[in-house]
Amino acid sequence: MSWSILELLRKNPEDLKNNLKRRAIDVSLVDKAVELDKKWRQVLQEVEKLRHQHNVLSSQISKLSGEERKKKIEESKNLLKILEEKEKELEEIENERDRLLSSLPNLVADDVPNGPDDSYNVPIKFWGKFKVYEGDVQEFLKQIKDAKVNYEVIKWKPKGHAEMLEDVLHLGNTLKAAEIAGSRFYYLFNDIVWLDFSLLLFAIDYITQQGYTLVLPPYMLRGEVIQSVIDLDTFKDAIYKIENEDLYLIATAEHPIAAMFFKEEIEKDKLPLKFAGISPAFRKEASAANKDLKGIFRVHQFHKVEQFIFSTPEDSWKYHSELITNAESIFQQLELPYRIVNIASGDLGACAAKKFDLEVWMPAQAKFREMVSCSNCTDWQAFRMKIRYVDRKNNRRGYVHTLNSTAIASTRTITAILENYQREDGVVEVPKVLRKYLEAFPKAPKDYIYPLKNKII
């Protein structure tokens, strides 16, 4: 099976144009690619004809002798030079065509909402009991629209996670971190650190019980690899590069896991391959210069557990559903109320054919905030990384499909816990599902996180 974008280019370039229009992409690139592909196929025919002629000559030479043999050998040498030049031309055209096609985003799935930005995202599910301050009820109802949800109106206004972390609990300090490292860094202390680790342990415990292989991946990738996994030209302001080194810090375990089979083939009967990666995540957040400046919701480093699947093309949508179901189960066990959102075409990243976000209700902010991103990247990454499956039984090869989803992003989930589990007196309840991961440690919180009387720093 050929790459889906190339296949659509050949079968129906107008459909490819229409697909790109859903992302507001310049469709003139399709016309350029069509011309390059026509040229490639034309030169390929010439190359195949020359190869045939050379094979015929080689066969004739083996049966000749004397001057006739010398004449044919010279003719063969000249033909070989022409063939080599044509093969070089073919390779150059193919590289130019594939470079152009590789600059295109993935094909958008049919059931993705059309729209240029996140205002066109469509909520498709709500879960849990939503805690809503009495002054925010109208705003809440506006956000849920006509959905039937279970919510509780409270008379006291919950404090934002940043205030809870630094001014109430005294278990974090972003100002001092900013002095020594810059904005969007933090110090976390004692019970919040235990909470961070318990979230990670819970996530890897749950996901591995679903049959996923636990992975601790490299925290850096070479330029060639990261360029294949993501659209680096678009995301260069989001990724940290090591100065004077061909190395980039990873933004998620998705990237090194996706590259695990870089330029390799996988036997079809071994698919699916399911992994749970745990790693730090490093992000510049340059495009979010004025967003979430306080607290630890949007930061340059955090811990993350990622789900990742290599799949056959025919099964990838089934596994996309599995990934978001796993993520939902995690947040249901944490008892954090959320909604699932089908992301609009103009808000999709280049890699994804379709993406679900899981957004938790934040009662202090009176809004839903993204905790999980779950994408089916179909063959977009696999083509760029040259990862194929081999079907020996039917003598076929094709590109695998890759899928990814957050299981837990620790700092974001902590912000959701601080806002949803706080009491009016400032005490924060530890989610019940996390408590067994804390029991073995004498200094870890067990049931509640209590405010300190004094700041640590």
Curated annotation (Swiss-Prot):
Entry-linked SUPFAM superfamilies: Class II aaRS and biotin synthetases, tRNA-binding arm
The signal sequence is none
Molecular-function GO term, any one: serine-tRNA ligase activity
Q: Which Pfam families match?
A: Seryl_tRNA_N, tRNA-synt_2b
Where the protein is mainly located, per its record? Answer: cytoplasm
> Coiled-coil intervals in this record?
none
Could you say which EC number(s) this protein's record lists?
6.1.1.11
Amino acids binding ATP: R283, K284, E285, V299, E370, M371, V372, S373
Spell out the InterPro entries in the cross-references.
Answer: aa-tRNA-synt_IIb, aa-tRNA-synth_II, aa-tRNA-synth_II/BPL/LPL, Ser-tRNA-ligase_type_1, Ser-tRNA-synth_1_N, SerRS_1_N_sf, SerRS_core, tRNA-bd_arm
Q: Per UniProt, which keywords does this protein have? A: Aminoacyl-tRNA synthetase, ATP-binding, Cytoplasm, Ligase, Nucleotide-binding, Protein biosynthesis
Q: In which pathway does it act?
A: Aminoacyl-tRNA biosynthesis; selenocysteinyl-tRNA(Sec) biosynthesis; L-seryl-tRNA(Sec) from L-serine and tRNA(Sec): step 1/1
- Please tell me where L-serine binds in this chain: T252, A253, E254, E306, T406
Superkingdom of the source?
Archaea
CDD domains, A to Z: SerRS_core
One cellular component term (GO) for this entry is: cytosol
Write out the annotated subcellular location: Cytoplasm
Could you tell me the Gene Ontology terms of the biological process aspect for this record?
Answer: selenocysteine biosynthetic process; seryl-tRNA aminoacylation
Per its record, the protein catalyses: tRNA(Ser) + L-serine + ATP = L-seryl-tRNA(Ser) + AMP + diphosphate + H(+); tRNA(Sec) + L-serine + ATP = L-seryl-tRNA(Sec) + AMP + diphosphate + H(+)
What's said on domains? Consists of two distinct domains, a catalytic core and a N-terminal extension that is involved in tRNA binding.
Summarize the protein's role. Catalyzes the attachment of serine to tRNA(Ser). Is also able to aminoacylate tRNA(Sec) with serine, to form the misacylated tRNA L-seryl-tRNA(Sec), which will be further converted into selenocysteinyl-tRNA(Sec).
How this chain assembles, per its entry, is:
Homodimer. The tRNA molecule binds across the dimer.
The entry's family comment says: Belongs to the class-II aminoacyl-tRNA synthetase family. Type-1 seryl-tRNA synthetase subfamily.
Name of the protein in its database record: Serine--tRNA ligase
Gene source species? Saccharolobus solfataricus (strain ATCC 35092 / DSM 1617 / JCM 11322 / P2)
